[in-house]
């Protein structure tokens, strides 16, 4: 049986992982493509851990077998068998490649299934991901900057060497940036980023990365420090599109698309409520920076815009609060941040100008 030790190759191949750690461990950090089919649930793992501390390894192992026996053992075994049949190139994975993955491997062998496991477990894959990010972050980086609504993310996605950090983080960076998909844990985000870097690097002779000019955090996720340090020093190409064009991009992204996504996911009534709460939450998140009086004024305008959209389908009313929000908050904030990096700016132009400039590099 070929147990896995070529960790980079396993990550590059999107190898399916049958992760037998407890749910709480999986939620704290997992590899892309892993499915969680625990040998022990959280309470069972906690009981075994307590037993180990008080009575030693043999007693803990015996308790584990008592907790996972009979119908419970059979149900979990059937789930592992089904997962292996679905992913015949999959590997078993536990925390460190120890007891749990070996026990599941042995139980599967007793049914005639030879499923390899990851030697060193999740910890070995995690260390490989951290090392890969550090190594690949040493390559040159070019940042795409510009005010909100400049189409930076779209531009990055079009580059063969572009890394969509916001897509990986499941967040678009601003107070209105959340999507319908919950953000990953910090470790899972870092793992996903590492795999993306490895894949792009393997596809081509890479001169440099193209990334969006991000802050330290994207929603609840923060960029790995090794990458952040390189981005602070990187050259920047700045997109400067007309204000009207930026407004249309934001209309499409935040009002039309998000309304569609919420209603598609939850139905018309619940979807509308979720969409309305999403916009209110985005404004509420920056209330102190706006000042409470201005926040109250913009909230009233938002309420009127939502009423108009609900009755007529028109998103025009949203411009009455979006325009001042850009003029008074987002644009001054970004321009202030950009001024501090003025020495790093290597090109300015419209979205198309920057796209053409990138092709010529």
UniProtKB/Swiss-Prot annotation:
Residues the record marks as active site: 94 (s-selanylcysteine intermediate)
Catalytic activity, as annotated: 5-methylaminomethyl-2-thiouridine(34) in tRNA + selenophosphate + (2E)-geranyl diphosphate + H2O + H(+) = 5-methylaminomethyl-2-selenouridine(34) in tRNA + (2E)-thiogeraniol + phosphate + diphosphate; 5-methylaminomethyl-2-thiouridine(34) in tRNA + (2E)-geranyl diphosphate = 5-methylaminomethyl-S-(2E)-geranyl-thiouridine(34) in tRNA + diphosphate; 5-methylaminomethyl-S-(2E)-geranyl-thiouridine(34) in tRNA + selenophosphate + H(+) = 5-methylaminomethyl-2-(Se-phospho)selenouridine(34) in tRNA + (2E)-thiogeraniol; 5-methylaminomethyl-2-(Se-phospho)selenouridine(34) in tRNA + H2O = 5-methylaminomethyl-2-selenouridine(34) in tRNA + phosphate
GO biological process, one term: tRNA wobble uridine modification
Record's keyword annotation contains GTP-binding: no
EC main group: transferase
A Pfam match: Rhodanese
Keyword list, A-Z: Selenium, Transferase
E.C. designation(s): 2.9.1.3
Entry keyword annotation includes Oxidoreductase: no
SUPFAM superfamilies: Rhodanese/Cell cycle control phosphatase
Source taxon at top rank: Bacteria
Entry's Gene Ontology molecular function annotations: transferase activity, transferring alkyl or aryl (other than methyl) groups; tRNA 2-selenouridine synthase activity
Annotated Rhodanese domain residues: 11-134
Family: Belongs to the SelU family.
Subunit structure and binding partners: Monomer.
Function comment: Involved in the post-transcriptional modification of the uridine at the wobble position (U34) of tRNA(Lys), tRNA(Glu) and tRNA(Gln). Catalyzes the conversion of 2-thiouridine (S2U-RNA) to 2-selenouridine (Se2U-RNA). Acts in a two-step process involving geranylation of 2-thiouridine (S2U) to S-geranyl-2-thiouridine (geS2U) and subsequent selenation of the latter derivative to 2-selenouridine (Se2U) in the tRNA chain.
Protein name (record): tRNA 2-selenouridine synthase
Organism, as annotated: Salmonella schwarzengrund (strain CVM19633)
């Amino acid at each position: 049986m070929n147990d896995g030790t070529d960790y980079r190759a396993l990550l590059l191949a999107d190898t399916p992982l049958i992760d037998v750690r407890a749910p709480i461990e999986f939620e704290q950090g997992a590899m892309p493509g892993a499915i969680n089919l625990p040998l022990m649930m959280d309470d069972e793992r906690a009981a075994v851990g307590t037993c180990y501390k008080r009575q030693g390894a043999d007693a803990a192992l015996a308790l584990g077998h008592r907790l996972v026996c009979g119908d419970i053992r059979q149900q979990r075994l059937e789930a592992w068998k089904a997962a292996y049949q679905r992913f015949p190139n999959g590997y078993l994975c536990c925390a460190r490649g120890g007891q749990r993955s070996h026990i599941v491997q042995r139980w599967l062998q007793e049914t005639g299934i030879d499923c390899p496991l990851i030697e060193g477990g999740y910890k070995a894959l995690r260390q490989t991901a951290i090392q890969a990010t550090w190594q690949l972050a040493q390559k040159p980086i070019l940042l795409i900057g510009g005010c909100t609504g400049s189409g930076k993310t779209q531009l990055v996605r079009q580059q063969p060497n572009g890394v969509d950090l916001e897509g990986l983080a499941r967040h678009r960076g601003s107070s209105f940036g959340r999507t319908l998909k919950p953000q990953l844990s910090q470790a899972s985000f870092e793992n996903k980023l590492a795999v993306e870097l490895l894949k792009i690097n393997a596809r081509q002779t890479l001169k440099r990365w193209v990334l969006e000019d991000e802050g330290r955090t994207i929603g609840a996720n923060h960029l790995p420090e090794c990458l952040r340090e390189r981005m602070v020093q990187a050259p920047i190409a700045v997109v400067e599109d007309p204000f009207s064009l930026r407004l249309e991009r934001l209309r499409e992204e935040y009002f039309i698309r998000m309304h569609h996504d919420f209603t598609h996911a939850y139905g018309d009534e619940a979807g509308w409520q979720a969409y309305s709460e999403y916009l209110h939450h985005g404004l509420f998140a920056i209330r102190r920076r706006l000042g409470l009086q201005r926040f109250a004024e913009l909230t009233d305008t938002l309420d009127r815009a939502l009423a108009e959209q609900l009755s007529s389908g028109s998103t025009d009313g949203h411009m009455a609060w979006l325009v001042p929000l850009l003029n008074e908050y987002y644009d001054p904030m970004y321009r202030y941040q950009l001024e501090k990096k003025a020495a790093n700016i290597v090109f300015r132009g419209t979205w198309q100008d920057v796209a053409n400039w990138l092709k010529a590099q």
